[in-house]
């Protein structure tokens, strides 16, 4: 009985202490001992709940948007990987939920946005949801920090140079270095994207490939031979008042 009370007290003390630490310190704490590791390994613990609700609006934590990330810890991680309000076109702003960009209705402009965190190692997956009209061009993919985020006219900005790779959802074309790299997916009469569908983007920095999934169906490798550079989730849009959400999911599950 005494041991159980002591264990409960220890749990409560850790919960309070860890709630006041920043996230970098929590990472270090998980490496101190097995007990702390197991404590922090509970992704729905009150510690992760506290930090999650401290960063994210409560309504978004319960929304369908974050359904791919069911735990408090994964929701928090997704927030830190979401759109970067300091790395987007001047005609784009990030909504208060942190996960959705809004393109202002500016004529003769194509506008893009990048995520806060890029990748150079490992395998990563994120979901993109176009929540408004696509317009004449709507591109999802990746870019380096050197890729442009705004240009004149209505064009496929993402994929227009050697620093970006994209899939134009309107025409089902792959784009890189200003050239069309072929149709995608490689299906006869491939269905067009429908507003609200979730596209899962899979970046494999070990194999240097970029792939896509839709409705849990793997669509095949879109790009190979990606450079050994930090690559960021990116989209470019042309339609006024359209909105695009992005949710980082972590390491993709095989099969």
Curated annotation (Swiss-Prot):
Its main location: other. Pathway: Protein modification; protein ubiquitination. It comes from the Eukaryota. The keyword Membrane does not apply. SMART domains: SPRY (SM00449). It is found in: Synapse. GO terms for cellular component: cell cortex; neuromuscular junction; nucleus; pole plasm; SCF ubiquitin ligase complex. Residues 61-253 form the B30.2/SPRY domain. Keywords: Neurogenesis, Synapse, Ubl conjugation pathway. PROSITE patterns: B302_SPRY. The keyword Transferase does not apply. GO terms for biological process: negative regulation of gene expression; negative regulation of synaptic assembly at neuromuscular junction; neuromuscular synaptic transmission; positive regulation of protein catabolic process; proteasome-mediated ubiquitin-dependent protein catabolic process; protein ubiquitination; synapse assembly involved in innervation. Residues 3-51 form the F-box domain. Component of an E3 ubiquitin ligase complex composed of hiw and Fsn. Belongs to the FBXO45/Fsn family. Required in the presynaptic motoneuron to down-regulate the levels of wnd and restrain synaptic terminal growth at the neuromuscular junction (NMJ). This is F-box/SPRY domain-containing protein 1. It comes from Drosophila persimilis.
């Amino acid at each position: 009985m005494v041991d159980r009370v002591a264990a409960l007290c220890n749990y409560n003390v850790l919960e309070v202490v860890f709630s006041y630490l920043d996230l970098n310190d929590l990472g270090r704490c998980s490496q101190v001992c097995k007990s702390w590791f197991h404590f922090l390994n509970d992704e729905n613990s009150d510690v992760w709940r506290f930090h999650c609700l401290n960063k994210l609006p409560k309504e978004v934590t319960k929304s369908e948007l974050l359904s791919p990330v069911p735990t408090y810890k994964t929701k928090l991680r997704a927030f830190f990987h979401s759109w970067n309000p300091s790395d987007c076109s001047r005609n784009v702003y990030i909504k208060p939920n942190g996960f959705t960009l809004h393109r202002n209705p500016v004529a003769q402009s194509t506008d893009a946005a990048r995520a806060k965190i890029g990748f150079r190692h490992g395998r990563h997956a994120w979901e993109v949801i176009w929540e408004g009209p696509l317009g004449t061009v709507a591109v999802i993919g990746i870019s380096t920090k050197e890729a442009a985020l705004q240009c004149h006219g209505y064009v496929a900005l993402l994929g227009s140079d050697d620093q970006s790779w994209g899939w134009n959802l309107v025409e089902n074309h792959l784009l890189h270095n200003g050239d069309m790299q072929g149709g995608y997916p490689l299906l006869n009469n491939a269905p067009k994207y429908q507003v609200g569908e979730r596209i899962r983007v899979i970046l494999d920095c070990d194999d240097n490939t970029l792939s896509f999934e839709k409705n849990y169906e793997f669509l095949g490798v879109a790009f190979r031979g990606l450079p050994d550079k930090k690559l960021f989730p990116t989209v470019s849009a042309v339609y006024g008042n359209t909105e695009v959400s992005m949710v980082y999911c972590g390491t993709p599950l095989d099969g």
